[in-house]
Amino acid sequence: MNTDLRMPMGEGGLSRRRFALALPLLGACALVAPGDVLASADPRVQRASRVLMGTRVDLVTAATDARDARALQVAMQAAFTEMARLEALMSRYRSDSEVSRIGAASGLRPVPVSPEVMAVLRQAQRLHRGSAGAFDPTIGTLRGWHFEPGQEAAPSPAEITQGLRLVDARALVLDDAAGTAYLTQRGMALDLGGVAKLPILQAGLQVLERAGVAHALVNGGGDVLVLGSLQGRPWRVGVRDPAAPAQLMGVLELEGRGVVASSGDYERGFVRAGRRLHHI
């Protein structure tokens, strides 16, 4: 399950991870897709959206008193600011990010990293071990795929073979005491698109909590986190049928704390030589 951390608009605009696209059902029956921003008739419910990590991130917050509307807006802005800060640290599309600096120094020297990046790198290592190597954060050299309409492209077998020589998570050395990360082979590069989104969204939700928001939903391109409820009712997350995107496979009701994560190939992909290629 991969997502682009700050994909440039020229490389496909807004990208989203979707197997079954998780959509919040806000209100009694209203289906609100990620990317839709609705003006709320009830000032106790505030909504806002930003483009982050190459996708649309939606925040919904709720309060019991309409007089709290301004406080909700301020809290949401702070949450977006924190998520943007973390994205800037982990994006492979920014030359000044910590992830890019690690790649630039590969085979040369360890690079100091922030605690937030260190935590995500540690999680990436755990996922690598737990998946018997199927998940690998060092795939940054494999950049030849483009799945957006009109920009479809795939690397040649020779390019893939060459890139795979520089993919090996065991070459990622983390030093907690020194606070550094090091790729031991020159030319290696990181891609945290498959692991960084959820921690970034969680950080946004934590900002809301620290601001006193008790009821919130964070939706980032198929990853949905909820806190509390929506005016006394559970948050409702619809799951689309990948074979019939206009239809829902079902609806999940979440209350208190909950997470729904989904990803898939039915939108971002193309067929070449009889084979479907996609972003996962």
What are these model-derived regions, one by one?
Residues 2-280:
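Mature catalytic core of soluble alpha/beta enzymes
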